[in-house]
């Protein structure tokens, strides 16, 4: 009986770090898929409403603090009585963080962080250029773990694991 308990204890001790890494990977994938889902929703709302919809960080341009999908009161001809609408809001993503200070998806002309989908559903800058960029997700407890969210110029999102497919991540 003691031998069985010893074997179970050794097995649990050996497998625990692998289990923790797998849980961390699933958390990163979950946040990545949630962000992509909200981006798809923002694009569809822009198409449906026929007006710009923005996916942007909630706090000071930092994606770690969460993000929101909003519409209304955007563009050059906003009216004073305009009321914006928040469609979705995501809270903090702890223990998942955005590497590189999350200084991605910044419009070079306006300095605003976020993705603006125009009425045609295209992610474009204020000057009409296409947005193509990436966000890199990490986990606080497993620093070696990373996922890259890549938005191509055609509007297609993909999740890339640089540990497995380094060629696709560039």
Positions of the model-derived regions?
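Internal catalytic or translocation cores that form aromatic/hydrophobic pockets or channels
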Residues: 41
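N-terminal helix-rich module
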Residues: 2, 10, 14-36, 44, ...
């Amino acid at each position: 009986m003691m031998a069985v308990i010893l074997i179970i204890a050794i097995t649990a001790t050996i497998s625990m770090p692998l289990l923790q890494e797998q849980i961390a990977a699933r958390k990163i994938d979950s946040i990545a898929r949630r962000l992509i889902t909200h981006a798809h929703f923002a694009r569809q709302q822009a198409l449906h409403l026929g007006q710009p919809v923005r996916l942007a960080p909630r706090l000071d341009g930092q994606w770690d603090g969460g993000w929101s999908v909003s519409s209304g009161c955007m563009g050059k001809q906003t009216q004073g009585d305009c009321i914006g609408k928040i469609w979705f809001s995501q809270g903090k993503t702890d223990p998942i963080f955005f590497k590189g200070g999350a200084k991605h998806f910044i419009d070079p002309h306006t300095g605003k962080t976020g993705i603006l989908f125009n009425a045609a559903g295209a992610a474009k800058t204020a000057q009409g250029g296409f947005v193509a960029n990436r966000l890199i997700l990490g986990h606080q407890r497993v620093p070696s773990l990373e996922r890259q969210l890549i938005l191509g110029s055609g509007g297609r999102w993909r999740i890339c694991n640089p540990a497995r497919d380094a060629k696709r991540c560039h």
